[in-house]
Amino acid sequence: MPTYENIRLAIDDRVARITLCRQPLNILNIAMMKEINGALTTLSREILVAIVFDADKECRAFSAGVAVEDHAPEMVYQMLDSFHAIFRSLEQLAKPTIAVVDGPALGGGCELVSACDIVISSERGKFGQPEVKLGVFPPVAALLLPSIIGDKRARELILTGEIIDAVEAGRLRLCNHVVPVAQLEQKLMEVLSKVRELSGSALEFSRRALDLGRHQTLDEALKEVENIYLLELMKSYDATEGVKAFMEKRKPVWRNR
């Protein structure tokens, strides 16, 4: 089994567990993205009934999002390629995925949660896509959130950068289960006990069939949204200004172009 710096990978009884452990907030930089995708490549050779994503107990967030510095013009192509590779791998693997959230899941962290089939959150969970405040937008969330929480609410979250708590996330069906912190692992074990009784191949076929509900594959949709992000958005003044202002710890001065 490969070793990693920013994640841990464990396999037990046909369940893989990818634990994010880049303290304190599991900020997703390019190196961490590549480790996650490397772990998924390793798992493609395993017989599994589920892949679990969670965070190390020493971390204060599931993930507070993608590193802002990786949105800089000289890094953004590599960042987007590395980040979206995770979602392409998840679609190709077609294994049931479970996110276990205790604390904030924001930006890219919320997108990873949105891509999972089952989401279990503690009452401390926070969810949102604040990218618009940096002058950019969340490509994966733009594709996935409308079908999960409804078009109008997805538009509101993405266009305002609103952060919601776990109770609201549960009401919107972004989370399947919201439980007290002390019951988080117990709820995960309850879900895993159900899938461990099932055929891995039946689960994979079911996952692939569910994905057919989209009018196009995630890979095809990502290619289109990447064109908007890289060829249009990242050439705008405001995208550069938003990232620069964040790094300089000041309010952005928008020019609306």
Name each model feature, range by range.
Residues 13-21, 26, 31-74, 89-100, ...:
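A structural preference for short, pocket-lining loop segments at secondary-structure junctions
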Residues 1-13, 45-47, 56-59, 161-167, ...:
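C-terminal alpha-helix plus adjacent terminal tail
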Residues 72-82:
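A short acidic, glycine-rich active-site loop
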Residues 91-201, 236, 240-244, 250:
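Crotonase-fold acyl-CoA enzyme core
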Residues 82, 86, 140-144, 153, ...:
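Hydrophobic alpha-helical segments typical of transmembrane helices
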